[in-house]
Amino acid sequence: MTVVAIVGRPNVGKSTLFNRISKDNSALVDDLPGVTRDRNYARVSWNDKPFVIIDTAGFVGQDTSAFEELTREQILLALDEADILLFVADAKTGLHPGDAELADLLRRSSKPVFYAVNKIDGSEQRRHAAEFFELGLDRIYPISAAHGFGISELMDDLCAAIPEAPAQTAEEEESGGAIRVSILGRPNVGKSTLVNHLLGAPRVIVSPVPGTTRDAVDSHIVKAGQEYVLIDTAGIRRKGRTREKLEKISIIKALQSVERSHVVVLLLDAVEGVTDQDLHIAGYIKERSRACIVGINKWDAADKDPKRTKRFMDDLHDRFRFLTYAPVLTFSALTGRNVARLLPTVKEVFRQYNQRVTTGIVNRALEETLARHEPPQAGNRRRLKFYYATQTAVRPPTFVLFCNYPQAIHFSYERYLTNRFREAFGLDKTPIRLIFRPRQRTGGTS
């Protein structure tokens, strides 16, 4: 699929254009220069031409900042990946030396380049784009990413440069079997380092400074014939410690990434131990009924002390009692030690998360479960009776059990039923739901 990269100086409106083209708000947009620090990807279609669009961080030519050096490297990687380049400049600030440097860089790429001058809000303002012809350009597209002016003309011409290929819808791509994996955790726990190790390339900026990753960034990878979409998310802090508006937005986007995911890898720090914030994140994953793997990073810095590792594991098992189905893996994202176990575990967890059980097998398991431990009394009324059960959904596996007094089922007996169903159907690594309903009667009132 053709890849289009949006490039330009900071705060010229690249993310706004990205959102306009992709018709969503998947990239952070804020008035602060340098908001988008990693590349962000979206699969879109325009004029029935499917393509991938990349939103890159702002290009800064001369800057000694370590972050800017990392960002420049990311932009160069994006240029390597792209088939078509979309240059964006800012009409309000005018022609800038950084525009000239970037335009020279793009010309050397030998790839098709479309030059857009943003923040032109109508035909009467087209004259503000004229000075950019000093860059030696043959064609300039005056646009307003915020208001939509000129976007259709730009995108029609850009899509005409995309080679004809069999159209593939988003639904078809999704049905191709890709497992969507969010990597979630507190700031600086090693999420980006883990993603980069899995990819084998510096796809995400890595820095010891907490908060380096602000956006949730998608990366595609194929291992052993299985496609994965890795979502590296911004670190989540407690709300009280999140002071910048931008960081608050990133937290929301990280939690939204959970909604998009099949499996969530909750990354903990072996050195810092289990924190209240880890517990908070785990609770959110549980609440959303997502499949989960608990990954303990930096284990090589902790496993030299057996007493310390035992305390860590004891604390983990005690505080994560509600997440007992989640496999626990220990590794070092930095060195790669034991990281190879992660994706096979993701694949197995996802298999269970999607597992279906026939109604006959479900009811045989229910009969055996009831025979082993009869239902308790339903308060002062008759004994609780179960009539039949069926699976109604996957992601997670969901079972509806029909009985006479669904509201009277004690949580301890529900836990017993849940554990027996896990054992009977091989669902030890996925959340499952049990829903209790009164038996439906036909031919009269219930």
From Swiss-Prot:
Binding site for GTP 2: 185-192, 232-236, 297-300
Assembly information from the UniProt record: Associates with the 50S ribosomal subunit.
Residue stretches making up the KH-like domain: 355-440
Example of a GO biological process term: ribosome biogenesis
Name of protein: GTPase Der
Job description of the protein: GTPase that plays an essential role in the late steps of ribosome biogenesis.
Gene name per UniProt: der
Alphabetically ordered keywords of this record: GTP-binding, Nucleotide-binding, Repeat, Ribosome biogenesis
